[in-house]
From Swiss-Prot:
Annotated TM spans: 249-269
Extracellular topology ranges: 30-248
Stretches the record annotates as Disordered: 316-365
Keywords: Cell adhesion, Cell junction, Cell membrane, Disulfide bond, Glycoprotein, Immunoglobulin domain, Membrane, Phosphoprotein, Repeat, Signal, Tight junction, Transmembrane, Transmembrane helix
Name of the protein in its database record: Endothelial cell-selective adhesion molecule
Disulfide bonds: 174-224
Subunit structure: Interacts with MAGI1.
Ig-like V-type domain sequence ranges: 30-143
GO cellular component: adherens junction; bicellular tight junction; plasma membrane
Primary role: Can mediate aggregation most likely through a homophilic molecular interaction.
Cell compartment(s), UniProt: Cell junction, Adherens junction; Cell junction, Tight junction; Cell membrane
């Protein structure tokens, strides 16, 4: 088919039709255009035929030899009127998807529309002007019909709103994004047993199904059907009713765990800081305490008894053995030396004479030598022959 001319040519063709009608002389033939219906419906994606034909009064219905029709089809949308097909002087021009049902010349002017879309809805006008074999116009007629393109429901989407647990309330929603006319919804449960729902739990306009006080027996596969005059589409959702704790209990357990972990981390951090605080004073340098003074010890010459009588030799009560006399060769500890083995001296007895001083220096070593060796002199008290201290 030849593509349609522009709007300017369309207007010129319309003026041509009007001119032919005005110049037509009076004639016994009267042209009548017939459209059997004022409205037609079709489905999007399909095709439709807009029926139209004309007759001449007092003549047969079929075209006569030399009869020349001029045909134009127009479509008017919300903004402007467009020419979709024309047949003039044996030449047909049309838009894609638009054609005449019968070959021309013919008195049947039916128009076929293919690949319909919703935007093709609107009024269509057919205009016809006929000339006889002598080139004289036999008449002119124009009529309009309305086309309504219906759209079947697009596949809906099913959703579950709420937490499906025992005793809770949930809502099943179903929504189709596109349809003409508007769809209505129906919810059914298919498995494990069939069940149909009605108002008030079912909203056929919004497509919502309210389920209250859930129980385990209400679980199953729920199917939503969206339907209108020209089609049906459906979706489904599986409802599983749980008996576990609710969302609030789970959330509380999670929050409690997080708080416990936070407190534990705080205690560990506090313990770590206190450990550092105790280590720092231990590493500080402190001044040592003053050493005690050393008492002077008497010289070794002062260890001899003033009366010249030495009954026993001892260092101090702390240096004596706790029980019994010291054994020969016992260790005698001193404040500044480790221990030395000193023999226990024996007091010689004389008849009525005063005893002579006995040197306590063993081995014949002098007191000055012992001092150089580190020995410490010890004050020994004198005793009388009766055993009392002098």
């Amino acid at each position: 088919m030849i593509s349609l001319p522009g709007p300017l040519v369309t207007n010129l063709l319309r003026f041509l039709f009007l001119g032919l009608s005005a110049l037509a002389p009076p004639s016994r033939a009267e042209l009548q255009l017939h459209l059997p219906a004022n409205q037609l419906q079709a489905v999007e994606g399909g095709e439709v035929v807009l029926p139209a034909w004309y007759t001449l009064h007092a003549e047969v219905s079929s075209a006569q030899p030399g009869e020349v029709p001029f045909v134009m089809w127009f479509f008017k949308d919300k903004e402007k009127e467009d020419q979709v097909l024309s047949y003039i002087n044996g030449v047909t021009t049309s838009k894609p998807g638009v054609s005449l049902v019968y070959s021309m010349p013919s008195r049947n002017l039916s128009l076929r529309l293919e690949g319909l879309q919703e935007k093709d809805s609107g009024p269509y006008s057919c205009s016809v002007n006929v000339q006889d074999k002598n080139g004289q116009a036999s008449g002119h007629s124009i009529k309009t019909l309305e086309l309504n393109v219906l759209v079947p429901p697009a596949p809906p989407s099913c959703r579950l709103q709420g937490v499906p647990r025992v005793g809770a309330n949930v809502t099943l929603s179903c929504q189709s994004p596109r349809s003409k006319p508007a769809v209505q919804y129906q919810w059914d449960r298919q498995l494990p047993s069939f069940q149909t729902f009605f108002a008030p739990v079912l909203d056929v306009i919004r497509g919502s199904l309210s389920l209250t006080n859930l129980s385990s027996s209400m679980a199953g596969v729920y199917v939503c059907k969206a339907h209108n005059e020209v089609g049906t589409a459906q979706c489904n959702v599986t409802l599983e009713v749980s008996t576990g704790p609710g969302a609030a209990v789970v959330a509380g357990a999670v929050v409690g765990t997080l708080v416990g972990l936070g407190l534990l981390a705080g205690l560990v951090l506090l313990y770590h800081r206190r450990g550092k605080a105790l280590e720092e004073p231990a590493n500080d340098i402190k001044e040592d305490a003053i050493a005690p003074r050393t008492l002077p010890w008497p010289k070794s010459s002062d260890t001899i008894s003033k009366n010249g009588t030495l009954s026993s030799v001892t260092s101090a009560r702390a240096l004596r053995p706790p029980h019994g006399p010291p054994r020969p060769g016992a260790l005698t500890p001193t404040p500044s030396l480790s221990s030395q083995a000193l023999p226990s001296p024996r007091l010689p007895t004389t008849d009525g004479a005063n005893p002579q001083p006995i040197s306590l220096i063993p081995g014949g070593v002098s007191s000055s030598g012992l001092s150089r060796m580190g020995a410490v002199p010890v004050m020994v008290p004198a005793q009388s022959q009766a055993g009392s201290l002098v």
